[in-house]
């Protein structure tokens, strides 16, 4: 998680289930007028979103921002591709990693920081099915241990 993150608006829980997150980056979002109002209202879905580097710029695809209800004719397209703002060195580093096989850029969450919408972008490797099963077993074991301690303290 980036330092000093503010109010979390939306999280991509599926990304943590489907990928190993190696690094995270904080990126600004280039938005149109009513998009920031819809984000502040929490009308964002990151479930199928992904990011790509194209011509030295990072773009996020399939991020759904619902139209703002009071936006009438000035509303935006909910699934348009949006530009992400990163430092040039970060973009060059991401280009190097994404050209390697198995790495992809996944949006992890959207949050507000000092009034601006920011996105936590993760550099991720895909998990295999057995990795997912192993993570589920570990999670269940931790839950059982916590339950046992809780029951023990009640006595």
UniProtKB/Swiss-Prot annotation:
**Source superkingdom:** Bacteria
Q: What's the chief localization of this chain?
A: cytoplasm
Q: Which InterPro entries match?
A: SmpB, SsrA-bd_prot, SsrA-bd_prot_CS
What CDD domains does the record tag this protein with? SmpB (cd09294)
Q: Which SUPFAM superfamilies match?
A: Small protein B (SmpB)
What GO molecular function annotations does the UniProt record carry, in alphabetical order? Answer: RNA binding
The protein, known as: SsrA-binding protein
The top of its lineage is: Bacteria, Bacillati, Bacillota, Bacilli, Bacillales
